[in-house]
Amino acid sequence: MRGFVLTALALAAVWPSSGIEQLTRVDVSLGDVSINKVPQLVAADQGLYAKHGLDVHQTISAGAARAAAASGVVVPDAYVNRDASAAAPIEVGGGSPMINGFVNNARGAARVIVLTQEAMAMDHIIARPGIAGIQDLKGKRIGFSGVGSVTHFSALRLARQLGWSPDREITLVAGSANLDALKQGKVDAILASAMVIALAPQAGFKDIGDLTAYKMPMAGSGIMVDKAYLAAHRDTVLRFLKADIESTALMQRDRRVFNAALGKWFNIADARTQDGMFAHVKKFEKKPYPSVDGIKQVFAIYDSPEMRRHRPEEFYDSSLVAELDKSGFLDNPK
């Protein structure tokens, strides 16, 4: 697969509709390379950041770049943030790993979830030939990305749903939620999001199950903000949310915009693959309030003395989406 350029400089030639003549610089971490980041790329391509008065600079982490390469997606080095100490105030990623990182790592960023696009577990399970369905995973090795990650949460929550012990009846393998792990025989199946799901058939692997059917609440992909930054720059964060929500709505009603983004950034031009990925986009929340039920599930799945020192309310702020909802923006995002 050709490398793709991950850039998100807003179009300076497009003046924001609010009449503001100077764009506000915002640094954003996209976390990983996945379909959940397409709204941000579309927002840049279509001038939506600039429309809302923002000059957005987006990067992904070095670890995410390595993970993407393991499934055939190569990110140019210029767009990889290798300075882990330079944390962006706004992050697009999973709420579950954010909460785990803060609770279990003294250096974890004090962030709150302000928007959730994936309020239910939506990963699929991709398996090697010979495994017909999810029930056949008992006794097998299942790959996930890392402890506390969305794929780890999904694996543990699925095991609980099926009445399996994750310590005795399945083997969870960290750092293996990619096609290379399947190709090399390190695992029998992996938890995968839309990007890997789309690439799996051509690699000879089968999609054996969609976790959406289990209706498991989750603090999945969304927007998280440093608490201090939010307190000082609430209007900037609100404008970022407006650009994100408007971009998502644009993708959902205009397949050409979505298809163009897939072709440009991910080199995915196959119509069948695009159709499958668009089905995932159509599941994005119309009113993306922070997933409170999902956050509570994080506390339940990762119960520990340290986790019990915190409360779910520490990790979300619904007021921004509520403000946009009350104004009518969520019903007519433009």
Identify the function of each model-found stretch:
Residues 6-14:
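Bacterial N-terminal signal peptides
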Residues 232-309:
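Secondary-structure end/capping motifs
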Residues 303-334:
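Conserved C-terminal helix/tail region of periplasmic/extracytoplasmic solute-binding proteins
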Residues 16-18:
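N-terminal signal peptide c-region/cleavage motif recognized by signal peptidases
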Residues 96, 167, 177-265:
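Pocket-lining segment of extracytoplasmic ligand-binding domains
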